[in-house]
């Protein structure tokens, strides 16, 4: 039981009409409320190599299957690279690109808990715009590479707020050396 009104309701884009429209009508009539949920979050469709993911096509893949070849942080970054409301395409390119980005960004890993500046957080406050947040991390990386210490600190803080940098720098480097999953599941 969710109550008469609640904060967030989520579902796939395919459920907006008629399912969610009917759900709203029924809930509002049953409870006499002005709204059912304060926020609606509809995720985009998932494809694999630009084809609809389905068991009948034989291209259905689970996160556990992907984790056999990629660290959980790589998978997380790949997923966050597309806005939740847009279609997401699982493919090797996005996973490899995400791994390469993490390899670069870990150079500026800090185990200190630094407060993230609003200018770096504002993207998440705008409809969880993770692709823009990641674009900003790329900019922070460029500045950090040229010696800007504040950018290095903000890069680390920005990655952490996205649930990245779940391993310490040494563990990530060791992971790179062996080329297979050796990290524990924490932070994945």
Task: Identify the role of each PLM range.
Residues 1-114:
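Alpha-helical recognition segments enriched in aromatics with Gly/Pro capping
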Residues 62, 73-74, 97, 104, ...:
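Exposed alpha-helical structural elements
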Residues 87-90, 94-149:
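Helix-loop elements that line ligand-binding/catalytic pockets
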Residues 7, 35, 71, 129, ...:
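Poly-acidic low-complexity segments
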Residues 134-188:
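Basic, alpha-helical terminal appendages of large translation-related enzymes
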Residues 29, 65-68, 77, 100, ...:
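Charged/polar, solvent-exposed surface patches and flexible loops
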Residues 33, 81, 111, 126, ...:
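A structural signal for alpha-helix termini and helix-coil/disorder junctions
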